[in-house]
Structure formats: C-alpha cells, structure tokens
Amino acid sequence: MKTFGSTYRRALTIAMAAIMGFTPMLSIPAFASSHMDAPLITRDPSANTTDVYAFVRPDANGNKALNLALGVYPHQNPGIGPNKYNFDENVRYEIHVALGGDIAAGRPTLTYRFEFNTAFKSQKTLLQSYLGVIQNLDDAAQNLTQTYRITKIDYRNGTGTFIGQGAVPPNNQGNATPFYNEGDNGENPARKGVATATELDKYTRQAIVTFPNGYTAFAGQRDDGFFGDIQSIFDLLKLRNPGKDSQGGYNLHLMSLRVPLSELGGDQQTVGVFATTSRAMAPAQSTSGRGFLDLIRRPQFVQVARQGNPLFNEGLVAIEDKDTYSRTLPTTDGQIFRKYAENPELATLINLLIGGGQQLAIDKGRADIAAIFIPDLIKIDLSTDPVRLAGNGPGAATNPDDMGFSRLSIFGGDILESRAAGHPFRLPSQFLGLPAGKFFVPGGWPNGRRFGDDVVDIAIIALLSDLRNPAALKINDPFMGNYDGVTGNEMGFNKVFPYESTPQNGRNIVGMK
C-alpha cells in the first residue's frame, strides 16, 4: 500500500487520481455512456457501460452485504462466431461508492477497479476461444483466457489496496460450452435463473471467488438483464402491448462484487454508487524528458463512459450534453444536468405524443425527479432488511420471484423499513397509509437497483405522478404498471450471486426478436 498524502483528496475535484503508481485520469476530455446513450459510445463497445446495480443481500454466512454489479459491452449476439466479445485489457472498469457528505457532492469515497489481462494457450490456430469442449474453467480446451485483479482506492487517505484476483469463464458458444445450458447439452437453451448456488452452471460456480477479506467477486459473460421496448419508446412513443424486449436474446459482460458492510462503516447509513470506464490512450510523457514517467511509459487513461441511475442520460439529457455527461463526474451534475431532471423533456413528450396535448405529466419544477438523479448516483439505504429478489417470474414453477417482490418497486407495494435517515425517498409510514412511527424506502429502484426492477415502467409512473410533497403523494398509474408491454427478462434471474442470468447459447437463443 502506498500513501500520497493530504493533497490527494483535494485533487479529486479535478481528477480521480489512481493509486499504486497509476497515472491520473478523468481530467482529459472523453467520449461516451451506457447501452447506446451518447453518440460516440458506438465506437467503443467494450468500454460501453450498460447498467449499474446495488442492493443489500446476505453473504454466504448470512451477514448483510452490499452487492454491486456493472454491465458493459452490450448487444452481444450469441450466434456470431468466432466469439470475440471480451473484457478489454486497455480499459479500467470502476465502481465507485460515495459515503457521507460525498453523496451530495457527487464524488467517490471508494473506488473498486477491475483490470483485465488476456492470454492464449496457443496462437498457432484459428480457433480463437475454444480448442474443444471446455470441461472446467481454464482447462486445456479454453484457448483464450482472461484474468482480472481488483484494487480498492480510498480517497480519504490516498491509498490503494489489492482486493484479489480471479479468472473469467468462457463465453457461451454452445457445444464448446455445454455446462451453461439445460441438461449440460450445448444444443439446448441456456439455463434459466436458479435459487441456490449449487444449481448454478459449473463454469459460473468455478469463476466465483471469495477473498480472505470477505469480498466475493465474479466477472464474465451473462444474459443482458435489462428489459424494455426501447424501439417503441424512441419511435415517437408508439408503445405496444405486448412489447418487444430490445435486449432480448443478447449477452453482455458483467462484473459483480459483494462488499462487506464493515468495509463501508456499517449499515446505519445511505451510500451512493456509480461507475465509469476509462481507456488507455497515448503513453504519458515527462515535460523534462528525464522524468519517471518516461522510464516506465505508463499510459494515460481517459474516461469514456459513466453510469449511475438507469435511463438518465438516455431518457432525460439533451443530445448536446450527452457526451459531456460521459466525460464528467457527478460533482458537476447540479450545475450542468439539474435542468434536465427538474424540467424533463420526456414528460413534455408524453403529454404531446400520448396525451394529445393534455398534461398527463408535470414537466416543470420536478424536484422529486431531481432528488433521484442529481447527483447521478444510485442511492441505497443499507439499514433495511435484505431486498426481495426476482427469479423466473411471479408464480413460476421453478425459482419464482420472492414473495412480496414487485418489478415496480414502491409503485407495486414493495417497500422496506428504513432504520437510518439519509435516503431522499425515506417516507414516514403514515404517508403510505400505514400506522405512524416507522419509515420506509422503496424495495427496489430508486432505493438501489435490483435485477428485475422494471426501470422503464418505474420511471414513467414517476413522471406521471407527483412525488414532490411526501405528505401528499399523488400516484398516477393509468396503465397499471405496464407501459412498454415488457414486464420481465426472458431468462429470469438467479437469486444467488452473481444474480444476473446465464449467458445465452449461440446455437439456441431465447428471446431475440
């Protein structure tokens, strides 16, 4: 561990400087964000962030933990070969956690950095990823292998601590990777979500690593768990029922990290979470020509994507500022992006295109929407009981959703008792029609975000409603929580770490339309 001193913290407002000899980043202009949120991200898919998840669930010993996940590299068609979708060793993937006053300031207190390395067992073959049927993680048949290391950066004291390292399982090609699929048969579709760790496929089980410091990690390909009819939304809001899941059948790459709450100072608090990716650019140069950087020629890293709450950059920020969002930190959100949350154009479009000019949604002075998105960190109350989880749907024969889980979160009656102040949507029980004396927060987004939260419908209901006065909440849900006609993920979800479902099989794809 190396310490840089008190000046490190002050420098954070300019750049989240890297630790352990790494070079500063984020002070250089950058390019993009999320599934397809900003124009320039289409040129850099492996650095493109898709979704951030943060929720409270217990670890293997029953202790509450903060589960974090970052999805990248969207729109992976499983049927395309050779399968070249991989993490990028020239990209730093980072999940940031803000504590205390850092939440309102929009700056990270801690950063968890994932860095990858790629190797081949043999390059004297055209078989890039698979030399045969892969029986176990990193066996002789897995030609392309990736490993990763995780570093925790603490901006309070300028330290970097090695958390651990792991190996990435193979992508799901089909016959080369049979154990991902039903009946361990490469001709069958990928396994749907499961309820226990022993039911996970072999490759996923082998790739989950638990470190002596209490962290648990996974990095690898998964089914894209985001669901929504994005095509119809951007086709002049011509919503349809049933809708078509725009991410149905596609894979992505996921990094999951389970963080002990002792690492964050306990559970009597709210924390903020967001993520960034940064790409290695030209090697750094010393102005003197004799500096240390010239000797080691470390690359500079440029932030190319940022992701916090779902849909913000895609659904609220104007085109002229989308790339600005990608290259900035949440520290500037109040100055640059507050206007988009307080005066959401999407609400205006709902009134125009769906309401025919009638005011269905309030489109000015939305302090309630700004409380969610500004600064753009997912705020999560750690004081609650563990969240309820999505499985394979309500009433599914195997691995059904938890009792009380609602994809609509608070709008579906899914709430959790809050035992500590701090969350912007912490409501007194009497405001929810319950006996006075307690406080509650949403069971899912915008209190954290779970796999299975229907963020499209939640966002639309929030825009149609008036949440500005907690004592007089006005919930407007004319379509009963079904706006884009998509209510779940075709593969379901696991109810155990790493939670996102098995990657789709290239030979037998489920849900692609």
Positions of the model-derived regions?
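Bacterial N-terminal signal peptides that target proteins for export
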Residues: 2-15
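Short stretches within intrinsically disordered, low-complexity N-terminal or propeptide regions
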Residues: 13, 17-19, 32
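Surface-exposed extracytoplasmic segments
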Residues: 30-513
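Generic alpha-helix initiation/capping and coil-helix boundary signal
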Residues: 10-11, 25, 494
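Intrinsically disordered, low-complexity segments enriched in polar/charged small residues
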Residues: 14-15, 25, 54, 412
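C-terminal segment of classical bacterial N-terminal signal peptides
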Residues: 20-30
